[in-house]
Amino acid sequence: MRRHLAVIVFIAVSAAPAAALDLPARKPGLWQLDMTFVGRKLPPQSIKECLDAATDKLMNANVSGAGAGVTCSKQELSRSGATLTVDSVCTANGATVTSHAVVTGSFDSAYTVDVTSTRTGGPPMPGAAPGGTHESHTTIAAKWLGPCQPGQRAGDMIMGSGRTVNILDLQKQMQAAPKR
């Protein structure tokens, strides 16, 4: 369960634009991210996340390869009108992921991220067959719902199950965890 949660959190964070690639920041407030997966046996997921400018910037830095143990040999951004295309090759935990993402929409109201990726090596991923090369297609439809709700703090992610996880707290726990 914990591993599945980490994957969902990573996927949700992946919807954020990568700061190193100079993509627009998302509007602060409460965002809903609806994710569908092809090529992995995972059900659709819906997550709500409360953002402020600082949290969005931190999430973007983590996704763009600035996180510990992540090395990206390629990160390229191209723009054509309102469409952004990001191509990357990154390695972490012994896995190499080659991704092609197309982002359309507005980071103030609603956007869609369409990602195709190929993963080789590394530990097995939830919902994927063990070993070999895995191809997947993930679509993330994000929409701004309004201000964060009373009692929410920046970094709160409300999972489809209703459980709330704070990405900042999760990051601190992962940094404090003993290395294997």
Where are these regions (language model features)?
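Subset-of-secretome marker
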Residues: 21-180
